[in-house]
Amino acid sequence: MPARPTPPAVPLALALAAALAAPAPAAAARVKELADVVGVRENALYGYGLVVGLAGTGDSERVLFTQQSVAGMLGRLGIRIDPKDVRSRNVAAVMVTARLPPFARPGTRIDVAVASMGNARSLAGGLLLVTPLSGGDGKVYAVGQGPVQVAGYDAGAGGAELRKNTPTSGRVAGGATVERAVDFALGQAPLVLALRRPDLTTASRVAAAVNAKLGAGTARAVDPAAVELSPPPARKDDAVGFLAEVELLEVEADQRARVVVSERTGTVVAGDGVRLRPVAVAHGGLQVRVQRDPAVSQPAPFGAGRTVEATRDRAAAAEGAGGVVALPAAASVKDLARALDLLGATPRDLVAVLEAIRAAGALDADLEVLE
């Protein structure tokens, strides 16, 4: 098994400065940034087509389906030709895809993406011929055609080749015309908000905000991912206005504490609220200790304050028989990273330490390891 590439030695303080900065106060977001209305979504379209007008950079005669497609197209135009006789390299077979926006009406123009299927070297300068675009149900919803725009090139001579980006794929701006609308009537089906990041607390807050603004019983959190809406009788025939008012409501979204690490690159991203329980870790020559001490804040005699119980978190790190580095009181991933940074550790060391801390049950957060 080949060894994984070693990431560059980047100081932890620099690698984690943005991700582990001091948490900012939670900000409210509009409902339209947190959820989508069920049924109001884009639909994927696809089709098979031909790009012509290529300057010798199209498919070769070894691509049989391109030869058959050209012969079939010419046959529909009344020109009979054997597919084996098609030897032009000015044509390329392509897959054409597009996204049909919600509520798109016939006549609306949308962009399409084009990608080569054969061994064409470049689609630059090509023209996409009329291509029906179908949905998952097999019905044609749009028709694409137009000049292909490619953000790259492929040139070569004498065995040398120069390539930039991917010239075998491109776009046709406004290249498809919608011919059929998706059958969906807003207001006829039950109105449900689908949270983009399912969370019990966020769903409950959205329902509470809607009920506070539009009346009790207007919204109900069904589960962590869905909030069911019941418009008041006076708004039954005004689904658009009702949903527009709901979308503008501001809600403070909640989320689980999470740490995302990449073993391949040594990247560590920690969200707000990530905390470590008291734990001691030894990783190779590194030793890290996190502990929690009880503390009591006692007001002055005859003062107006009150006694408050708290905890004082401390973390320290050492390497071999070296000295100990003390950290401020706050057992967080930020403090752990700073302790390792002072010892010259790499981001990959932090990844390994976090995985061990999670396994020991001392990480109060979800740890997601990217491959």
From Swiss-Prot:
GO terms for molecular function: structural molecule activity. One of its GO terms (cellular component) is bacterial-type flagellum basal body, distal rod, P ring. It is found in: Periplasm; Bacterial flagellum basal body. The basal body constitutes a major portion of the flagellar organelle and consists of four rings (L,P,S, and M) mounted on a central rod. Residues 1-28 form the signal peptide. InterPro entries: Flag_FlgI. This is Flagellar P-ring protein. Assembles around the rod to form the L-ring and probably protects the motor/basal body from shearing forces during rotation. One of its GO terms (biological process) is bacterial-type flagellum-dependent cell motility. It comes from Anaeromyxobacter dehalogenans (strain 2CP-C). Pfam families: FlgI. Belongs to the FlgI family. Keywords: Bacterial flagellum, Periplasm, Signal.
